[in-house]
Swiss-Prot record:
GO terms for biological process: cytolysis in another organism; monoatomic cation transport; pore complex assembly. The lineage of its organism: Eukaryota, Metazoa, Cnidaria, Anthozoa, Hexacorallia. The keyword Secreted applies. Its main location: secreted. It is found in: Secreted; Nematocyst; Target cell membrane. GO terms for molecular function: channel activity; toxin activity. It comes from the Eukaryota. Changing W147A: Inhibition of direct binding of sphingomyelin. It comes from Actinia equina. This is DELTA-actitoxin-Aeq1a.
Length: 214
């Protein structure tokens, strides 16, 4: 009987020792997921939006050749409600933040399609503002920099309009987009609003936009 008790104790100790590292790994994985959720897809104080925050969003995507972190600060005096994101190229695992009140900023990301495919991260996100008009943001991070460059744009459309291929073409080709040239650019958006934005020229891109009263 005593031998059986000793064997039982030894087996219990071994099982406990192997279970602890597994639990630690699971806890670390859960913590990583929480950190990602706290950044990409989050709504933060507009005053805290910075390059450092956007770099954290990029880092959460891991080792991806073409990726982008997007931050849009709402100082418009209006509440924004998410409509959709249209991807011309690439994808995102993040759901567009649903409500962005005045004084807050939304965080979002995009990346190339998974696998050995030559795609960039190119798309448009659309928000319905509380005045009934639509805020649209274009981001374009190409795969081939021999032929293309980073581009971005921000515009307001009259009425409610979802992002789609047509909106992408308008913002990319026709409505004076800004090159991602590591500099700040400003624009009068109409409807009593203006924008100030920055995009770098890297394949690991950050796009920071502030929309405020004109």
């Amino acid at each position: 009987m005593s031998r059986l008790i000793i064997v039982f104790i030894v087996v219990t100790m071994i099982c406990s020792a192997t279970a602890l590292p597994s639990k630690k790994i699971i806890d670390e994985d859960e913590e990583d997921e929480k950190r990602s959720a706290d950044v990409a897809g989050a709504v933060i104080d507009g005053a805290s939006l910075s390059f450092d925050i956007l770099k954290t969003v990029l880092e959460a995507l891991g080792n991806v050749k073409r990726k982008i972190a997007v931050g849009v600060d709402n100082e418009s005096g209006k509440t924004w409600t998410a409509l959709n994101t249209y991807f011309r190229s690439g994808t995102s695992d993040i759901v567009l933040p649903h409500k962005v009140p005045h004084g807050k900023a939304l965080l979002y990301n995009g990346q190339k399609d998974r696998g050995p495919v030559a795609t960039g991260a190119v798309g448009v996100l659309a928000y319905l503002m509380s005045d009934g008009n639509t805020l649209a943001v274009l981001f374009s991070v190409p795969y081939d920099y021999n032929w293309y460059s980073n581009w971005w744009n921000v515009r307001i459309y009259k009425g409610k309009r979802r992002a789609d291929q047509r909106m992408y073409e308008e913002l990319y080709y026709n409505l004076s987009p800004f090159r991602g040239d590591n500099g700040w650019h400003t624009r009068n958006l109409g409807y009593g609003l203006k924008s100030r934005g920055f995009m770098n020229s890297s394949g690991h891109a950050i796009l920071e936009i502030h929309v405020s009263k004109a």
